A protein has these predicted regions:
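Intrinsic, short, N-terminal disordered tails of RNA polymerase sigma-factor systems
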Residues: 1-8, 12-15
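Short, charged helix-capping/linker segments at alpha-helix termini
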Residues: 2-4, 18-27, 37-56
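Regular secondary-structure segments
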Residues: 11-18, 58, 62
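Hydrophobic/aromatic residues within well-ordered alpha-helical segments
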Residues: 28-32, 36, 82-85
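Structural recognition of an alpha-helix C-terminal capping motif at a helix-to-coil junction
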Residues: 38, 52-59, 72-84
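Short alpha-helix-to-loop micro-motif enriched in aromatics/charged/Gly
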Residues: 66-71
Length: 90
């Protein structure tokens, strides 16, 4: 079964990730990594550095996922982490 079919909603995906499910973590990364790389690239202007910033950002996403309260946009929450991580790079 593909990862796309394992989680019926974003809320279920986040809850599974909060419980430490590695499949949920992979799915979140696959779903958002291309958009988040674009955000990081706007700050880094170098593919290698942007990818490093994005990876550090996802480490924070998974480390802090318990602080996301399922209110508001999950993508927006991830985006804010990526922007903050990018600003720390500058």
């Amino acid at each position: 079964m593909k990862l796309l079919n394992l989680f019926q909603s974003e809320e279920a995906l986040v809850k599974a990730c909060q419980k430490g499910d590695p499949n949920a973590q992979r799915r979140i990364y696959e779903k958002y990594s291309s958009k988040m790389l674009g955000i990081c690239f706007r700050y880094a202007h170098d593919d290698y550095e942007a990818e490093g910033i994005m990876i550090e950002g996802f480490v924070k996403v998974f480390d802090k996922i318990d602080s996301f309260k399922l209110e508001g946009s999950f993508e927006g929450w991830i985006r804010r982490i990526m922007v903050n991580e990018s600003l720390m790079y500058l």
